[in-house]
Amino acid sequence: MLKVFTCPCRGPGPTGPKFTTFKVRGSDRDSADGQGDGDGPVIRLTSADRFVSPRTLPARGTVTVKNVADTIHFMAISPVKKGTTDKQIQAFFDSKAQVQPPFFLNGPSVGMDVLSPGRQLELTYKLPAGTYVLMCFIADDVTGMPHAFMGMHKVVILK
């Protein structure tokens, strides 16, 4: 399935609004079938507010991201220092520190916007090889706490 959208990307200028066209490819397949549309890895966003994914992902390529939860999620992929663990990340969030985490690195990151329950998308990216963390900062619909603070993060290696 291919949908083509045209939308204004800036307000009106001297010659009128500026428009851009983008294409979105989706699937008519049931997103709960356990398979991605391509041959690449699958990352699942779960109702337990966790990521289920391979520990190693490609540094460049396409992954299928499936929201198998009953709530919305999104995913950011951010670089962290080699050797960083999920336990360290959780300890930092639990500390409620107001400084940049000591394990975070400046560098390119990618992500996707909100994905509704039962939906999937193909995320294509190119990042330097290294250690990264997957995180979701959607606020919990009951507590208001960001999902990442509740444990929705996963350290992965991009090769």
Residue ranges and their predicted role:
Residues 65-69:
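Asparagine-centered strand-capping/turn motif at beta-strand->loop junctions
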Residues 74-84:
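Extended low-complexity, serine/threonine- and proline-enriched intrinsically disordered segments
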